[in-house]
A protein has these predicted regions:
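Glycine-rich beta-strand-turn "strand-cap" elements at beta-sheet edges
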Residues: 2, 41-48, 74-104
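An amphipathic, aromatic/His-enriched active-site/gating alpha helix that lines ligand/cofactor pockets
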Residues: 25-39, 55-89
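Short coil/turn motifs at secondary-structure junctions
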Residues: 12-14, 45, 57-59
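Exposed loop/turn and edge beta-strand positions of beta-sandwich/beta-sheet ligand-binding modules
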Residues: 5, 36, 46
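Short, surface-exposed ligand-recognition loops at beta-strand->loop->(often short) alpha-helix junctions
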Residues: 10-20
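Short, 15-30-residue, compositionally biased linear elements
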Residues: 20-21, 41
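Active-site-flanking beta-strand signature of metal-NTP-handling nucleotidyl enzymes
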Residues: 3-9
Length: 104
């Protein structure tokens, strides 16, 4: 079963652009080098929060992502640039209705 993660980040206002750049760099590396990464999509909320929606093929793909250099580089690049700790939620789907519309 695929694993979906939502990571929410609140950048310090003066570091917003640097945080976005770091996330975009990590996004490109995940897309290019992680076969089991099915989705790694950055979005911005209307309140300025940044949300990375991630989907991994399985536990092994998530483990590879977690152990990869791109994530370590991202964590280092974000040091001191967030106003609160990153909120990471590992989600379990509860599909209803049409399967294609009820899960990520």
């Amino acid at each position: 079963m695929a694993i979906v993660i939502v990571a929410t980040l609140v950048p310090v206002p003066e570091h917003r652009d640097a945080v976005i750049a770091a996330l975009e760099t990590a996004q490109g590396k995940a897309h290019a080098a992680e076969d089991g990464t099915l989705l790694y999509a950055l979005h911005e909320g209307r309140d300025g929060r940044l949300v990375m929606i991630e989907k991994f093929a399985d536990d092994a793909a998530l483990a590879a992502h977690s152990a990869g250099g791109a994530l370590a580089e991202l964590v280092a690049a974000l040091d001191g640039k967030l106003s609160a700790p990153m909120d990471v939620q590992v989600l379990t789907p509860h599909p209803a209705g049409l399967a294609a519309k009820g899960t990520l």
